């Protein structure tokens, strides 16, 4: 039974780097957009959902660093940035909203590789633990 649980945990850990990379890729793509469009808002909502999924997956995998909380915050902030962009009536308000969005997206680009690395470290530690257990 413990072996099955450990296997499920490591499978989850092996998927985390791909999810972190997806969050990073989405953040980079959204950063390049310069106009408020329905596609931008939908992209931000997708990014927010993926950041929230990454947060939950990190938490479920037992990553004890602040990363689950950080990605939860990024997901919440992304939704707020989408609302801010939709409410912006003037060029100045739009410029401010885009600046705020880009700051958030830049943070995601910088932090997503840390999430992938933390998951890889945990997967390696889990594999070593299983190897030791099998030898005993």
Which role does the model predict for each range below?
Residues 133-136:
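Short, solvent-exposed mixed-charge patches
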Residues 85-99:
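Amphipathic, charged alpha-helical scaffolds that flank and support histidine-based chemistry
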């Amino acid at each position: 039974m413990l072996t099955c649980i450990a296997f499920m945990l490591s499978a989850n850990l092996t998927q985390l780097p791909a999810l972190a990379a997806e969050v990073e890729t989405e953040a980079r793509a959204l950063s390049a957009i310069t106009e408020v469009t329905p596609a931008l808002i939908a992209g931000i909502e997708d990014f927010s959902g993926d950041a929230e999924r990454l947060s939950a997956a990190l938490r479920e995998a037992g990553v004890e660093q602040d990363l689950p909380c950080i990605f939860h915050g990024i997901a919440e902030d992304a939704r707020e940035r989408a609302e801010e962009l939709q409410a912006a009536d003037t060029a100045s308000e739009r410029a401010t909203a885009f600046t705020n969005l880009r700051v958030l997206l830049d943070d995601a680009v910088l932090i997503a590789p840390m999430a992938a690395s933390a998951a890889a470290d945990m997967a390696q530690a889990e594999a070593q633990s299983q190897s030791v257990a099998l030898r005993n």
